[in-house]
Curated annotation (Swiss-Prot):
The chain crosses the membrane at residues 10-30, 56-76, 92-112, 120-140, 172-192, 200-220, 234-254. Pathway: Protein modification; lipoprotein biosynthesis (diacylglyceryl transfer). PROSITE patterns: LGT (PS01311). HAMAP family: Lgt. The gene is lgt. Belongs to the Lgt family. InterPro entries: Lgt. This is Phosphatidylglycerol--prolipoprotein diacylglyceryl transferase. Pfam families: LGT (PF01790).
Length: 266
């Protein structure tokens, strides 16, 4: 068993003002995505300025935050938030959904594309390789917060999390997700998007790979207490939400290569 590193979730405390590592991870993800996007901008559209790119990143970030919060409300704990709607605004208490954030990003991308003469999938293909930076940073934030841990296990790398009332050795599922959704997904999309691909293919690859990775990790991750398993003693809400991503991603890739020749890389 490995010892859990006791990291204070509060990174900086200035009197009553407390800045948490989880919030800083959002900044790392957004900043890293902007930096990488700026390096790829000329290949995407040489006429775009850094200011326009910053606008895109801003609206995508808003989509992540608003969509992530509302997605958690609707997908994971709807009854509790309907009973007390003011809880929706108490974001410091936790509760963000990747799938809600993805919907928020898609809406923000569609809106931004309409205003700037770009199709939805042109922008999504450009954005997709940037997303794993934020995903990886977010999972590190989950690990520091000692939340979203895995099932009890006797593997050599199991950890006892301080927030676990049972104090059992568990899978560090946050680190599994960091490795898969962050490192592996970034590597796949980075190399896949370096070569010319038809529009929609990069978006499809992102959706399919993320869906598969998340579906796998859900087998060792403890489901949200208020939901538990939804069917057959193992199916979680996360897995249900990943199924359309996997099927839709595969469908997008197949359709992309069928409908058009390869164009410039995103």
């Amino acid at each position: 068993m490995l010892p859990y590193p006791q990291i204070d979730p509060v990174a900086i405390a200035l009197g009553p003002l407390k800045i948490h590592w989880y919030g800083l991870m959002y900044l790392v993800g957004i900043g890293g995505a902007w930096w990488l996007a700026s390096r790829r901008l000329a290949r995407f559209d040489a006429s775009w300025s850094k200011e326009k790119l910053s606008d895109l990143v801003f609206w995508v970030a808003m989509g992540v935050i608003l969509g992530g919060r509302l997605g958690y409300v609707f997908f994971y704990d709807f009854a509790a938030y309907i009973a007390e709607p003011a809880k929706i605004l108490r974001v410091w208490e936790g509760g963000m959904s990747f799938h809600g954030g993805l919907i928020g990003v898609m809406l923000a991308t569609w809106w931004f594309g309409k205003r700037n003469g770009k199709s939805f999938f042109e922008l999504m293909d450009f954005i997709a390789p940037l997303v794993p930076i934020g995903l990886g940073a977010g999972r590190i934030g989950n690990f520091i917060n000692a939340e979203l841990w895995g099932k009890a296990t006797d593997v050599p790398w199991a950890m006892v999390f301080p927030t676990d009332p049972e104090q059992l050795a568990r899978h560090p599922s946050q680190l599994y997700q960091f490795a898969l959704e962050g490192v592996a997904l970034f590597t796949i999309l980075w190399f896949y998007s370096r070569k010319p691909r038809p529009t929609m293919a990069v978006s499809g690859m992102f959706a399919a790979c993320y869906g598969v990775f998340r579906f796998i990790v859900e087998f060792v991750r403890v489901p949200d207490a208020q939901l538990g398993y939804l069917a057959w003693g193992w199916l979680t809400m996360g897995q249900i939400l990943c199924l359309p991503m996997i099927l839709g991603g595969i469908g997008l890739i197949a359709y992309a290569y069928k409908r058009q020749p390869v164009q410039g890389a995103a």
